[in-house]
Amino acid sequence: MSDVSTNLYKSQLLDYYYQRRAESSINKGSRFLISKAVFGTSSLVTKKGDGTYEIGELPKAFELAELTSQFCTINLVPTYSGGIITVRMDLDQSQLQEGKNYPFNTLVVLDNENKPIAIICVQEDSLYVGKTYTAVMAINTTTA
C-alpha cells in the first residue's frame, strides 16, 4: 500500500487522546471511549493563489470550536485487531439538506466527553445528498 501525500491528507492524534487513555487506564475520570466524528471545515486547510489547497501543520491540541463549520455528527463503532484500532467514518446523508452543497476539509474525532482526540484534514471537497464519503483512521496502539 502506498502512502498518501501530505498535500492530500494529514491526520493527528491529539495530546488529549494520550492523556484520556492514560487516565482511563488508572480509573481516573470516566471510561475513555472513541465515540463520535464531526464533519466540517477548518482554517487548517487554506486556498492558495493558484486555486489549490494547502493543509497546514496539524496541532497537538484542537478544540471543536475551532471548526469554521460543522454539518454532520456521527456515532462511531471502532474495531480492534492486532494492535490497531480502526475508526470508520461514513457521512450520514440524512443530516444534510437536499440540494445544498457542504464544503468539507476537516473531520474531528471525539471521545465520550465530546472533546477532540484526533483530527483529519483533506483537500477541500464538496459533500451533498447523493455523494457518499467514507474516511478510515487506523490507530496503532503498539506505538506512542
UniProtKB/Swiss-Prot annotation:
Free-text function comment from the UniProt entry: Structural or assembly protein of tail fibers.
Protein name: Tail fiber protein R
Organism from which the protein derives: Escherichia phage P1
